[in-house]
């Protein structure tokens, strides 16, 4: 689905986000999105590490 979005579509989405939230809110939104992605990656890494360790114990 997202692979069909070209460069013009991406620009359109970014402009729509800018209009919706305004330039003052964008850094806050970006920061919270980054923290969310960081936490998600950390959780998935911990789950895979736990699963790998349990597999080695058996």
From Swiss-Prot:
Chief localisation class: membrane
Record's subcellular location: Cell membrane
Disulfide bonds: none
GO BP field: protein transport by the Tat complex
Coiled-coil region: none
Gene3D superfamilies: 1.20.5.3310
Alphabetic keyword roster: Cell membrane, Membrane, Protein transport, Translocation, Transmembrane, Transmembrane helix, Transport
Assembly and oligomerization: Forms a complex with TatC.
Name of the protein described by the UniProt record: Sec-independent protein translocase protein TatA
Source species: Bacillus cytotoxicus (strain DSM 22905 / CIP 110041 / 391-98 / NVH 391-98)
Lineage of producing organism: Bacteria, Bacillati, Bacillota, Bacilli, Bacillales
């Amino acid at each position: 689905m997202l692979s069909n979005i070209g460069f013009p579509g991406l620009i359109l989405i970014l402009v729509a986000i800018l209009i919706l939230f305004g330039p003052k809110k964008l850094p806050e939104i970006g920061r919270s999105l980054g923290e969310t992605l960081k936490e998600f990656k950390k959780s998935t890494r911990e789950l895979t590490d736990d699963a790998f360790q349990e597999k080695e114990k058996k």
